[in-house]
């Protein structure tokens, strides 16, 4: 499976649109958040497993890039790639597209932390979840790193 995952699809709802007639910035994050939920289910951290294991993922950092306008009613999909992982963290990349399109509309690079909810405190991946993370990492290993990953926001220093 050397391809990104399609993790979420939705139409752009009227209540998500701002006064400029396009998707409000906060709702890009909502769509990407739902895609993260689907990724969690894919690796075995769905609601049933979260309740049984007492483990979940928390978002540590999120970078959003808005590339093209998205209008009300447009059907969009999120494609997700696991860029890397360690014992407790996932580094992921979400990209928003029109289905069947090769042009990204928005990007979200995120760092997620695996946690034990009884603290909450960080916790290493274990068992089936670890096996699924490792399988996904292996499947995505040959994929190219998306453009803009690791980008830093800022202006040149004033001299």
From Swiss-Prot:
One of its GO terms (biological process) is carnitine catabolic process. It catalyses: N,N,N-trimethylglycyl-CoA + H2O = glycine betaine + CoA + H(+). One of its GO terms (molecular function) is fatty acyl-CoA hydrolase activity. InterPro entries: 4-hydroxybenzoyl-CoA_TE, HotDog_dom_sf. SUPFAM superfamilies: Thioesterase/thiol ester dehydrase-isomerase. Its EC number is 3.1.2.33. Disulfide bonds: none annotated. Induction: Highly induced by carnitine via the CdhR transcriptional regulator. Not induced by glycine betaine or pyruvate. Disruption phenotype: Cells are incapable of growth on carnitine. It comes from the Bacteria. Pathway: Amine and polyamine metabolism; carnitine metabolism. Keywords: Hydrolase. Catalyzes the cleavage of betainyl-CoA (N,N,N-trimethylglycyl-CoA) into glycine betaine and coenzyme A. Is involved in a L-carnitine degradation pathway that allows P.aeruginosa to grow on L-carnitine as the sole source of carbon and nitrogen. Belongs to the betainyl-CoA thioesterase family. This is Betainyl-CoA thioesterase. It comes from Pseudomonas aeruginosa (strain ATCC 15692 / DSM 22644 / CIP 104116 / JCM 14847 / LMG 12228 / 1C / PRS 101 / PAO1).
